[in-house]
Amino acid sequence: MTLQEIKEFLLGVTLNTFHQEAWEQPDTYIVWQEDGESDAVHGDNKKLVQILDVTIDVYTKEEYPEIITRLQNAFNDKGIPFELLSIQYESDTKYTHYEYLIQAVV
């Protein structure tokens, strides 16, 4: 999955999707960002394929957020391996923050 495909995929889950920083903060939104290289394929002294870790952060003020079910079902429907890294309540903003990890091929 490319970075553009990740963007389009997340926009299919919610239009409140932002890359790197949310300039709006509705009650529920997603911010995604590339984190760094997790793997690569080399040949003839060149990098042929680069795999990036991509963090997807979901912020919501809902107690039992439907967006989490929608996102995880969408991951499974598209065959995208994912890992839920953490769930944290942020008392200063009143958001619950879900952090996912997926990979992108660049």
Residue positions per predicted region:
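Short, conserved charged micro-motifs
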Residues: 63-70
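Small/polar-rich, solvent-exposed N-terminal microdomains that initiate assembly or binding
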Residues: 1-42, 63
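Short glycine-rich, basic-tinged beta-strand/loop micro-motifs
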Residues: 48-60
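Residues that form or flank phosphate/diphosphate-binding pockets in enzymes
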Residues: 27, 66, 93
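Short, charged interaction patches at domain edges and termini
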Residues: 1-3, 7, 35-51, 85-106
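Helix N-cap motif at beta-to-alpha junctions
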Residues: 61-63, 105
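A common structural junction motif
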Residues: 14-15, 74-82
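Conserved short beta-strand edge segments in small beta-sheet-based binding/regulatory domains
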Residues: 20, 81-87
